[in-house]
Each structure stands twice: as C-alpha cells, then as structure tokens.
C-alpha cells in the first residue's frame, strides 16, 4: 500500500490524531498514516451506536479497523469537536496512552448539508450558515487549543489543516456561498497563524486541500462506485480529474515522513502538488493535479481531457 515509500513503515512509532475521520478525506488520511505504520486516533460523531446529523452509515470504528488492516494501529474515540470537554478528554487519553503526539490532522467539517449553493447571504438560512461556520472553524480552534500543548512537547510535530482549495485558487475564485467561502479560506489562514506559533517549538503547520475527491458522498451523488467512477463522466466530463481520498492521505503520510517538512511551514498545499514533489501516486498509479486542470482546462472552456494532468 505504501509502495511510494522506500521504507514501507516510515511512520512506525508515530502517533497521529485525525480529527474528523469518519469518512472522506479524514478516513483516507487515517488509512494511509496507518499504512505507513502509525498509531492513529480517529474521531468523529458517528459510531456503531449513534449517527450524527449526517445520518450516514460510515463509522469511526470502521475507520479504525481500516487503519489496523493497513498495517497501523487504529483507535476510535467518539468525539464532538464542538464540545471542549470532550476534546480535552480525548487529548488527555492520548497523553496517558502514548509518548506524546506527533501529527494532528484537523479534517473536521460536517457542513455539506448546510450549504445553500449560489444563494446570496441575505437569502441563505442564517441558522445553517452560522452552524456551518461553527463546524468548520470553531472545531479546529478548540482541537488546536487542547492538542497542541501535547504536540509541542517535543520538536518535529506536524499540524495539517484540511480545507478545500489552495490559497492561490481561493484568492481569485468565489466558492459559491459566502458562508462556505469564509469557512474554507479561514482554515487556510488558521494554518498560517499556527505556523508562527508552533515554529518556535520545532513544529510545522500547513493547510492542505485534496482535489475533486471521490468521497462516499460524491460517489453516491453520481450514482457510481469506486470501481465504476468513470461512468460519472457521462454526466460531468471534468470528473475525469477526480481522485480518491487515499491520494490526499498519501500526501499527509509523505509530509509526516519527511524530516525536512519544516520547509513547508505556513504554506497552502495540495495533494497534486505534493505528489509532484514527493513522487507518490493515487491508488491507480496516476498523479491528478486538480487545481491546475480546473484553471487550464475546465475554466478555459477546453474539452474534458486529463492527459498531462494525471
């Protein structure tokens, strides 16, 4: 699974927390950290006993099992990251059970069903918009508040703030909702701010975005499976540039395994950009460069063709 790394278990002995790992990018990241040998704490609100407001079947127990099957050690801890006492208890448990925390991935989101796309702010549901911002921003702030003291106990810690879109892309593109736009650009700025706070302790903080990701929800949207995803290109031809959640997972694993990762401190990164630098691939052996494709092909009005972009 980690053929892209000379050392099949470069993260053996590494302790990671993937906050928001029930599905999507968080699950892909947790699995790839596990494939690299890490112990991975995975959190979320949906368990075998209880579903979150998403009302979806994926659970954190499933994610933890996938981490262990990949070669790591997955530990599921039900956590609502809007509840400070729950996050504090989570970090206290990691501190008791492990010798510190090496990697923190903040992938908490939960706003898909709250966004009203292409609706101006004065028409958008205020309750949904504010709830979206709490889920997208407050959760990250709360988690950093409690987890970073453990992470900075020793040098070399890595913080990855997951978002949608690189800073360069988002600076020139309206993300179809004021609430969504603010949520995703705020997380990028948070990573930049954190980079200044963890650097004196030998830490690194970055913002990271996947490309057009074939998450569980996206596959369902197009009524396809991972095995048949190309069928979706009949409805949306530019879906040809899409990638699996494991691709951005390999990006995080590559960062965590890089002893020189501090060179990225404060930067806004993408799965495709890091693949070009580190040489890892998606599960099909390709290297999709989504944001370059979006600008140079889709937005340029060219026919859908991923040749040269994956």
Regions found by a protein language model. Name each.
Residues 207, 227-310:
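C-terminal helical subdomain
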Residues 139-144, 158, 168, 187, ...:
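Conserved internal alpha-helix within the Rossmann fold of NAD(P)-dependent oxidoreductases
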Residues 36, 97-98, 111-116, 146-155, ...:
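A short helix-coil junction within the Rossmann-fold of NAD(P)-dependent oxidoreductases
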Residues 110-114, 122-126, 157-200, 211-213, ...:
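Catalytic loop of short-chain dehydrogenase/reductase
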Residues 131-153, 167, 195-196, 200:
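Amphipathic alpha-helical dimer-interface segment in Rossmann-like NAD(P)H-dependent oxidoreductases
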Residues 18-19, 106-109, 136, 157-167, ...:
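Structural signature of the Rossmann-like NAD(P)-dependent dehydrogenase/reductase core
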Residues 14, 72-73, 100-101, 151-165, ...:
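Active-site loop of short-chain dehydrogenase/reductase
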């Amino acid at each position: 699974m980690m053929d892209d790394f000379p050392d099949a278990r470069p993260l053996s002995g590494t302790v990671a927390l993937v906050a928001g790992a029930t599905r999507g990018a968080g699950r892909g990241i947790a699995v790839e950290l596990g494939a690299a040998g890490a112990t991975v704490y995975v959190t979320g609100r949906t368990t075998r006993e209880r579903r979150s407001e998403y009302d979806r079947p994926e659970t954190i127990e499933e994610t933890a099992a996938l981490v262990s099957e990949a070669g790591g050690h997955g530990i599921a801890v039900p956590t609502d990251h809007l509840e400070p006492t729950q996050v504090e208890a989570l970090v206290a448990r990691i501190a008791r059970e492990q010798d510190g925390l090496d990697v923190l991935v903040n992938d908490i989101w939960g706003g898909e069903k709250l966004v009203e796309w292409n609706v101006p702010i004065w028409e958008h549901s205020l309750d949904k918009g504010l709830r979206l911002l709490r889920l997208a921003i407050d959760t990250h702030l709360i988690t950093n508040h409690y987890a970073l003291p453990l992470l900075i106990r020793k040098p070399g810690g890595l913080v990855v703030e997951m978002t949608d879109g690189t800073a360069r892309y988002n600076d020139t593109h309206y993300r179809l909702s004021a609430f969504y736009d603010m949520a995703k650009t705020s997380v990028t700025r948070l990573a930049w701010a954190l980079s200044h706070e963890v650097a004196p302790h030998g830490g690194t903080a970055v913002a990271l975005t996947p490309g057009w990701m074939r998450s569980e929800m996206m596959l369902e949207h197009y009524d396809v499976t991972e095995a048949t995803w190309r069928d979706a290109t009949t409805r949306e031809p530019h879906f040809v540039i899409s990638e699996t959640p494991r691709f951005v997972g390999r990006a995080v694993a590559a960062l965590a395994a890089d002893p020189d990762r501090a060179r990225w401190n404060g930067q806004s990164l993408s799965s495709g950009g890091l693949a070009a630098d580190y040489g890892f691939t998606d599960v099909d052996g390709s290297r999709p460069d989504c944001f370059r494709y979006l600008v140079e092909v889709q937005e340029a009005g060219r026919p859908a063709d991923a040749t040269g972009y994956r």
